């Protein structure tokens, strides 16, 4: 990529229909893990006007009221009025869970290459990424896209902007000069709103109360603001669009700054490497950058179903590494256990911590439960690299 360019990332709020689905799926997962930490869960959700459908594969000893979990999640998000198109009290919730296939279970329960360890729950490839564009070691565009819709939610919940409704989207376009963020070129923010507010009022409030308090002022240089550019956003959430689990995988990760292996996260227990290995790859990449081994780091891992050890662990630092990418990859394999069971132990993943991940990004958030955001291996890596 050229050194001078524009790059865009987007995010969506907790009230976006796809995020409603993600949060319900992860709330179901958490409710199960709270009772049965070894459960196998693949919980999918569809939500539309007045309707929630829960489907997938679950094998567990837990006794969970799935319908109540779905209603509680919808209530927490803020869909508590029939005028919003879905109401936690009155919506229909259909449950259609099956059990995990025994053909899959036999490979996960016992790995074909290591009988003392758990095999991967599926084949696949996963990526982790980190860079020094923000203190959280995340790309600037996706980090601030998340913070914008998070701010929208805060102002809706605390009543400062009472006409806001749960659904919102943000998009941040950043101008890079010499490969570094230089300024914010364009901000798009679309927010659902009450019908009796004017476009002029929305625009002023969004720019002054949401955008400017979030974005660094030194980055706002001739920035273009596009606020509700269609002119009206009253119908939103699951009424405006059907929501599905796993439809916001780029929002969930790095906003397009890194490749994505294609596997979604929400609703999946840690035996699914789509989720756990992507978290581990972020943990690896963040520690590499925190150690000063590179300014940016992309990690790819891949697995075969029923096999514990990753097929490959590949590191790419885009020319920013202090040592070779191959040497960093060697250090990664020496200091991180990337077998599925090793990941679960390393990051303490058998906990009901996942609903919080399902909105505003799985990465780049300093939450106490987000063990994959720790940089506790940075000093070890730095010493091992001889820096």
Swiss-Prot record:
Gene name in the database record: metK
Record-stated family: Belongs to the AdoMet synthase family.
GO molecular function, one term: magnesium ion binding
Name the UniProt record assigns to this protein: S-adenosylmethionine synthase
Family annotation (NCBIfam families): metK (TIGR01034)
Cofactor (UniProt): Mg(2+); K(+)
Renumbered residue ranges of the record's region Flexible loop: 100-110
Coiled-coil regions listed: none
UniProt record, GO biological process: one-carbon metabolic process; S-adenosylmethionine biosynthetic process
InterPro entries, A to Z: ADOMET_SYNTHASE_CS, S-AdoMet_synt_C, S-AdoMet_synt_central, S-AdoMet_synt_N, S-AdoMet_synthetase, S-AdoMet_synthetase_sfam
GO cellular component terms given for this protein: cytoplasm
Positions that bind Mg(2+): 18
Residues reported in the UniProt entry to bind K(+): 44
Main location as per UniProt: cytoplasm
Recorded catalytic activity of this chain's protein: L-methionine + ATP + H2O = S-adenosyl-L-methionine + phosphate + diphosphate
Positions that bind L-methionine: 57, 100, 241, 272
Pathway: Amino-acid biosynthesis; S-adenosyl-L-methionine biosynthesis; S-adenosyl-L-methionine from L-methionine: step 1/1
Binding site for ATP: 16, 167-169, 232-233, 241, 247-248, 264, 268
Subunit structure: Homotetramer; dimer of dimers.
The entry's keywords: ATP-binding, Cytoplasm, Magnesium, Metal-binding, Nucleotide-binding, One-carbon metabolism, Potassium, Transferase
PANTHER family the UniProt entry points to: S-ADENOSYLMETHIONINE SYNTHETASE
Cofactor binding note: Binds 2 divalent ions per subunit.
Job of this protein: Catalyzes the formation of S-adenosylmethionine (AdoMet) from methionine and ATP. The overall synthetic reaction is composed of two sequential steps, AdoMet formation and the subsequent tripolyphosphate hydrolysis which occurs prior to release of AdoMet from the enzyme.
Compartment annotation: Cytoplasm
Species assigned in the record: Cupriavidus pinatubonensis (strain JMP 134 / LMG 1197)
């Amino acid at each position: 990529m050229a050194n001078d360019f524009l790059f865009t990332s987007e995010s969506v709020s907790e009230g976006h229909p796809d995020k409603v689905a993600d949060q319900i799926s992860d709330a179901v997962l958490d409710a199960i893990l709270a009772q049965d930490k070894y459960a196998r869960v693949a919980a999918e959700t569809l939500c539309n006007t007045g309707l929630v459908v829960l489907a997938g594969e679950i094998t567990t000893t837990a006794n969970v009221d799935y319908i109540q979990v779905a209603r509680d999640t919808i209530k927490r998000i803020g869909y508590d009025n029939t005028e919003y198109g879905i109401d936690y009290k009155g919506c229909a919730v259909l449950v259609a869970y099956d059990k995990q296939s025994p053909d899959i279970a036999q490979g996960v329960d016992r790995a074909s290459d290591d009988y003392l360890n758990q095999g991967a729950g599926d084949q696949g490839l996963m990526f982790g990424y980190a860079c020094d564009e923000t203190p959280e070691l995340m790309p600037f565009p996706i980090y601030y896209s998340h913070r914008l819709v998070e701010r929208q939610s805060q102002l809706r919940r605390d009543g400062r902007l009472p006409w806001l409704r749960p659904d919102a989207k943000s998009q941040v376009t950043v101008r890079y000069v010499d490969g570094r963020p230089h300024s914010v070129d364009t901000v798009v923010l679309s927010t659902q709103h009450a019908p009796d507010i004017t476009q002029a009022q929305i625009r002023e409030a969004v720019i002054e109360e949401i955008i400017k308090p979030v974005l660094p002022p030194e980055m706002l240089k001739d920035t273009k603001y596009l606020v509700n550019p269609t002119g009206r956003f009253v119908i939103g959430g699951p009424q405006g669009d059907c929501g599905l689990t796993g439809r916001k995988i780029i929002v969930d990760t790095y906003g397009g700054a890194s490749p994505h292996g294609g596997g979604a996260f929400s609703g999946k227990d840690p035996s699914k490497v789509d989720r756990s290995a992507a978290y581990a790859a972020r943990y690896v990449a963040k520690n590499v950058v925190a150690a000063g081994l590179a300014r940016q780091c992309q990690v790819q891992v891949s697995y075969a179903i029923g096999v514990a050890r990753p097929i490959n662990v590949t590191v790419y630092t885009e020319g920013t590494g202090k040592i070779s990418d191959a040497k960093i990859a060697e250090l990664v394999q020496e200091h991180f256990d990337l077998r599925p069971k090793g990941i679960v132990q390393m990051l303490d993943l058998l906990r009901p911590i996942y609903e919080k991940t399902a909105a505003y990004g799985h990465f780049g958030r300093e939450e106490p439960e987000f063990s994959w955001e720790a940089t506790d291996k940075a000093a070890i890596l730095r010493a091992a690299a001889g820096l």
